[in-house]
Amino acid sequence: NCIKEVLAEYRVPKIGGIPPLTGGFVGYFGYDFVQYCEPSLQFDPTKATDFPDFDLMLFDKIVAFDHLKQKLFIIVNVRTDNLEVNYAKAEREITAVEALLSSSVAQRPFIAAKLGEVKSNQSKDLYAANVQKCKKYIKNGDVFQIVYSQKFTADYDQDLFNAYRILRTTNPSQYMVLMKNDDVEIA
């Protein structure tokens, strides 16, 4: 409900010709967050991840790039409570973003990274056995969907921006994201 209350103050009209995301919350809900939505599920705190259960950031400014059309959008939302003042402020913010984007930035080279030993939280045999259990639960009608995963970890000696750039080049996806804040970095 808290998220809905905040978003109620940020309603924007649909405007043709611009990306559908013009602001709002960006972030993630971790797998362990399900314990708050489905109290009937038993949660084992000893198996919790090191990630926060969720991390949301509220944006009222967006720089979006349409890779298909090779077009950049600078979107600044304007609050309507003091329209003239807020509109002028938004124009200044757009000008500042344009200046920042137009400035010369040194291209960071791809850096050969060293990946440490890849470790899993379970053996291949255990994973396969658990997938079979999941299929049985679905077939029996106990559940209709299971998002079962296997956690892999490895030490990585570069920042994740480098990994993100490599992934974006070798295996692009419309859902790719690089998120970095004080607590966590995800690519």
Report each predicted region and the residues it spans.
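Extended alpha-helical targeting/anchoring segments
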Residues: 1-187
